[in-house]
Swiss-Prot record:
Subunit structure: Part of the 50S ribosomal subunit.
Name listed for the protein in its UniProt record: Large ribosomal subunit protein uL4
Species whose genome carries this gene: Latilactobacillus sakei subsp. sakei (strain 23K)
Function in brief: One of the primary rRNA binding proteins, this protein initially binds near the 5'-end of the 23S rRNA. It is important during the early stages of 50S assembly. It makes multiple contacts with different domains of the 23S rRNA in the assembled 50S subunit and ribosome.
UniProt keyword list: Ribonucleoprotein, Ribosomal protein, RNA-binding, rRNA-binding
Organism lineage string: Bacteria, Bacillati, Bacillota, Bacilli, Lactobacillales
Transmembrane stretches, start-end: none
Stated family: Belongs to the universal ribosomal protein uL4 family.
Classification via SUPFAM superfamilies: Ribosomal protein L4
Superkingdom: Bacteria
Region called Disordered, residue ranges: 49-78
Gene: rplD
One MF annotation (Gene Ontology) recorded for this entry: rRNA binding
Cited InterPro entries: Ribosomal_uL4 (IPR002136), Ribosomal_uL4-like (IPR013005), Ribosomal_uL4_dom_sf (IPR023574)
Record flagged with keyword rRNA-binding: yes
Length: 207
């Protein structure tokens, strides 16, 4: 099994922690990661775009002139697409862009990006965080002690505690609970910080 250093909140080392090789030591599959990112970005699209077709534009119920005898081209409505102010043909309508990859593919994608963090030495495991109240400044000091000065994803066992409240207002810091870890957030941040409890929870789900 692979080992990584276990840190305390003050930045000091507290031994090593073993990682499950089936999650943290696989060969990263870039194609699957790409597919997972596209899927996740698609699900973030609002899909509220809309235009009015000829049935939705107000007016146009009366034939503008009689069918024959005027010498002009026949017309049935002033809201036909060829008219100024007419409806739009084949325009966008509200829709959902979300779709799902197979469960095994999604799991392979998250395992691939987690393994890549180990390969790049961008994984940091902390035994636990302890804050008596939401203190953004104190969490910033913790990051300095851990020598983290870039975009970082912090994964906690539970996102509803003082640690999450302390970290969420810092620029370049993203906080998610262990059951909310995802490919897009892992790829979008250079460093990955896990608590020991979050690590256990991730391995329990993905193993």
């Amino acid at each position: 099994m692979a080992n990584v250093t276990l840190f305390k909140q003050d930045g000091s080392q507290n031994g090593n922690v073993e990682l499950n090789d089936s999650i943290w030591a696989i060969e990263p599959n870039e194609n699957v990661v790409f597919d997972a990112i596209i899927m996740q970005r698609a699900s973030l699209r609002q899909g509220t775009h809309a235009v009015k077709n000829r049935s939705a534009v107000r007016g146009g119920g009366r034939k503008p002139w009689r069918q024959k005898g005027t010498g002009r081209a026949r017309q049935g409505s002033i809201r036909s697409p060829q008219w100024r102010g007419g409806g739009v043909v084949f325009g966008p309508t509200p829709r959902s862009y979300s779709y799902k990859l197979p469960r095994k593919v999604r799991r392979l994608a998250i395992k691939s990006v987690l393994s890549q963090k180990v390969i790049d030495n961008d994984l940091i495991v902390v035994d636990s965080f302890s804050f008596d109240a939401p203190k953004t400044k104190e969490f910033a000091e913790v990051l300095n002690k851990l020598d983290v000065n870039t975009k970082v994803l912090v994964v906690l066992e539970d996102g509803n505690d003082f640690t999450a409240l302390s970290a969420r207002n810092l620029p370049n810091v993203t906080v998610v609970p262990a059951d909310g870890i995802n490919v897009l957030d892992v790829v979008g941040n250079q460093k990955l910080i896990l608590t020991q409890a979050a690590l256990s929870k991730i391995e329990e789900v993905l193993a």
